[in-house]
Structures are given as structure tokens and as C-alpha cells.
UniProtKB/Swiss-Prot annotation:
Pfam families: Radical_SAM (PF04055), RlmN_N (PF21016). Belongs to the radical SAM superfamily. RlmN family. PANTHER family: 23S RRNA METHYLTRANSFERASE (PTHR30544), RADICAL SAM CORE DOMAIN-CONTAINING PROTEIN (PTHR30544:SF5). The active site is at E120, C378. Reaction proceeds by a ping-pong mechanism involving intermediate methylation of a conserved cysteine residue. HAMAP family: RNA_methyltr_RlmN. The lineage of its organism: Bacteria, Pseudomonadati, Pseudomonadota, Alphaproteobacteria, Hyphomicrobiales. It comes from Rhizobium leguminosarum bv. trifolii (strain WSM2304). NCBIfam families: rRNA_mod_RlmN (TIGR00048). Its main location: cytoplasm. Its EC number is 2.1.1.192. This is Dual-specificity RNA methyltransferase RlmN.
Amino acid sequence: MSVMDAIVVSKPPAHTSASLEKPSLIGLSREEMGAALRERGVAEKQIKMRVAQLWNWIYVRGVSDFDHMTNVAKDMREMLKQHFTIARPEIVEEQVSNDGTRKWLLRFPPRGAGRPVEIEAVYIPEEGRGTLCISSQVGCTLTCSFCHTGTQRLVRNLTAEEILSQLLLARDRLGDFPDREAPQGTIMPAEGRKVSNIVMMGMGEPLYNFDAVKQALLIATDGDGLSLSRRRVTLSTSGVVPEIFRTGEEIGVMLAISLHAVRDDLRDILVPINKKYPLKELIEACKAYPGLSNARRITFEYVMLKDVNDSLEDAKGLIKLLKGVPAKINLIPFNPWPGTNYQCSDWEQIEKFADFINSAGYASPIRTPRGRDILAACGQLKSESERMRKTERLAFEAMMIANHGADD
């Protein structure tokens, strides 16, 4: 096997303008789904029952075609097909790393962006669990200097449907719904769910898309549907302080902070949002996070940059900064990407840093880099069309239009 397996699994399907305009039932709350059915003439006395049926088929059985809903009357299925969709996003490309990590490049409709947009989702299999890294925006506004995604301009927010669709598609591809099988040779947990954990650590800043992220995660953790434990869902933010308390209060998932520096002058460079919400405000918001305890610690992400933030003085500053916060500190060896000016800290220095933090009583695992060969690792996500120079991208888009609806 080569270092990177890149598999183009689909071409743009032929859509009519009418089909593109159909609203999706994915991402709607029960109340919104009921209102949508009511608007299409479903009798009031049937609404609750029909919503329960649809919820089960979409989120428990994982169907993406109304015709597969065998206990729904045929005339109801025809109405649903005519007015709604539950289709998955288009897979532009699926890449499989030599460590089993999978990265999907997904395409969604323009929705005001002027052209179809692309995002990436990453699946990381480990012993005992499988983690899906989900994107919340197309691009990012934060321009963190060490992050590849930060070099891509923000195009638009993802909808709740588009956020949830990443999870549904991953479970499809991994055989994680009833009566489904995974592709032969797929690396994943031997027992239990194939997707057991979600991290909102993909493209974008989740708290700059709070409402859609909230709706998607509440559906993902709904006990009558996808039924993920909230303790297995982690939302990562670079420090949008006003929304941190709301995240705990209204969503109730685990929190991770992209910290990366212990001094404001350095964090202003590495994570520019620090200029708006400096470290003191960020740490105070963390201390007030609802449900915070030794059993529900905040994870602080700290990318290790050679001769930038990896000294023992930085380690001492980190301990001082986090005093009084139940915390785990994830040390992340920097993942290189083309054009970056940063280097990864020497492994010996990373271990010294970790040992110092451990001796102060903080868990400080060193995150094993995953999917580096397919640019799927932390800080490397960036949609393929945005990596290209403008002329290449235009040529690529022209090819996509030319292939629109083409047969294999």
C-alpha cells in the first residue's frame, strides 16, 4: 500500500434545480419537523406519530431514501419525496491514511456562497473508540498563524443539517447503522460503535456558529436517535468568551480550549482572537463553565512549536495560568503543512514539557499525530479547492461542470 490512498468515490450527481430547492428534514427539531409536515397537509392527529417514525428512520436506522421507510404509508412516502430530502452530501473524495484515519472531502450547495462549498471531516479509529472530527464552518475567520485551516477565508457557516450530515455520512461509510457493513479492510474499534466520540475540531470556530452547532449537537445526543453521550462530545473553541458559558448551559458537552500560549503577547500572534478575549477573561470563563468538576475537566490544547512556546518557562506559566481549573492538557506535536514557518518541537523537549506538567498533577498526554500523510491531522484541514491557486481552481470547477451528471 502506498503512503496515501486517495480514492475518488463519486462525481457530482445530476440534480435538477427543483431537487436542490427541497428542504432537508435532517437537522430539524421535532417541533420544526412537525411544522413542516403540517404545512404539507399531514393531519394534526398524525403529526406526533409521523415525527416519531421519521426520527427513528433518519437517526436510528440511518436511511437516506424515503422509499426505505417500510412502515410509512406509500402515499406519505410519495409526499415526502416530492417535498423533502434526507440525502447525504456529495463525497468528492475519500482518503485513507496508512494508520486507518479517513478523511472525506464533502460538497454542499452554495446557499449564498456563489458556488458549491467543500468541507472536510476526519475519522480517527483507536482501540476502544472511534472519533469523528466535524467541521462547523466553510473556512475560518480566526487566522491562527500555525493552523492550515486558518489560511482559508471564511465562506459561510454550515447549517445544522450540514453538521449532522457529516456524522450520518461517516456512520454510513463505516457500517455503523443497523444492517450495514463496513468496507473490507477498514480499521476501526473491535467492539461497540464505530463512531463513539465526536469532536467539534474541524474547519471553523464552532462558537461563531452557535445556533446551528447547538441544534446539531442536541440532535446527536438525543436519546431516541443517534444517542451519543454528551460526555463523548467535545466542542473546541479558540476562546469566544461570551459563548462559553452558554455552551455548558445549553448544550452540556465537554469543552476544549485551543490555548497554545501562556502569555498574551505570544497568544495574540498564535491565536489572534486573544486580542479581543485575553487570557484572563478566557480562564475566568473556563472556571465558570457549568458542570465543571474533576470528572468533567476542560481539555486545553497546546501545540508544540519549536523555540516558540516549548520552554520550561512556558510549562511553568501553563501551570500557573490553569491553577484552580480542573484540566487536562493535550500536548500536540505540530503537524507541518506546505508554506508554514513553524517547526515541531524536538521530541525530547516535548517529553520534558510533559513530565513537568505531570509532576504538577495535570494529565498531559502527548497526542499521537494521525493522518499526517493525508493532511488530516490537527491544524491541517483545508478544503482541496481552497488549496489550489485560483487558475487551478477555476480549471477544476470547469471540469466539475463538464462532468456534471456524467456516467462512470
